[in-house]
C-alpha cells in the first residue's frame, strides 16, 4: 500500500486538491452509510490498487489484482462499483469548474504579472493587445463585429438525466457558498450537512435514462441548460470582455454589444425523424417561450423590488404620473405581461386551453424598449452605476436569448 496519496498529489492546485479530497470523503461516507462497510471496503481496495497501478506502470501485478477482484463480483456489485467511480469523476469535474471560477475571481481582483492558463477569453485578448502590429482600435472594431452562433442539439448518446444535471448545479452553488464561508465554522457545518444530503440523494437517484426521449423532452433538456447555466453565464462573459477593453483602452464595449446567439435543433430536426411533426414543433416553440417568460418575469420582479428610487426622467413621469416609486410603477406592466404570457402558454400546453395572441409578449423589443427608457433615466440622474448592474445584465440577456431563448432551426431533409 502506498504511504502517500499520489492521486491527489497529481492534481495541479492545492485548492482543487482540497475540493476533490473533500468531495471524495463525502462520497465515501455516503457509500458507507447507504451500502455498508463491506462495499465501502471494496471501493477503497479497488481505488488503492488503481493508484498503485498508475504509480507502477512497469509492473503488471496491481492491474492483475484489480482484474481478479472484479471477476469475483456479482453483476449488481459490479454495477454499484461502476457507479461509485462514475460519481467520483463527476464530482472531480464539478470541483474543476469551481476551481476555474475561483481562478477567474483571482484574475479579476488581483493585479499581477504572472500569466494565467485556461482563462481563455482574457488570454486571447491580452495577447492581441500585446501585439504592437495590431492597432487597439482595430481590436476594438473586431470585437464589436463578433458574431457567434451556438447551436444546442440532443446527442443520441447523451444519457445523463436532467434531474442529475440540476443536482450537480445545486451542489456547485453550495460548494461556492462554502468557499466564501471558510472562516465561519458554524455555517460550514450547516453547508457540510447540505452537501452530504445532496450527495446521498444523488447516490440514490437512477442516473440513466431508461427510455428514448421525445422531441419535447429533448427540448426541455436544452432549456434546462439555458436556465441552469447559460442564463447567468452570458452577462458574466460580457462583463469580462468589457473589463479587458476598459483595462487596455480606457473604454468599454458598446452597451448594445451582443455577439452571441443561440439556436436549437431540438424539436425542429425532421430529417429521418417522423415524430417531429408540425404540432410537435409548435409545442416546442411555445415551451421555449413559456420558459423565457418565466425567466424574464423572475428577473423583472428582482429589478422592481430593488428599484425604490424616486428621482427619474420626465419621460417616465409622463407615463406613471406623480409617485414616490416611479421605476416600480413603470416596470410593472412589463412584468405583468410576462406573467400573462407564461400563464397563457402554460394553459395551452397542459390543458389545450386556447389563448389570444394579444395576451402574449410577441417580440424582444417589447422587453428592451422600457428597459432602455429606465437606463436613460438612471444615467440622467447620476445613477450610471445602477444602470450598469442588474439592468444591463437583463438587457444583454434579452438581446442574446430573445423571447424564445434559442432560435429553432428547421431541417426538413439533410441533402437540402
Residue ranges and their predicted role:
Residues 1-416:
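Often metal-dependent polyanion-binding catalytic scaffolds in large enzymes
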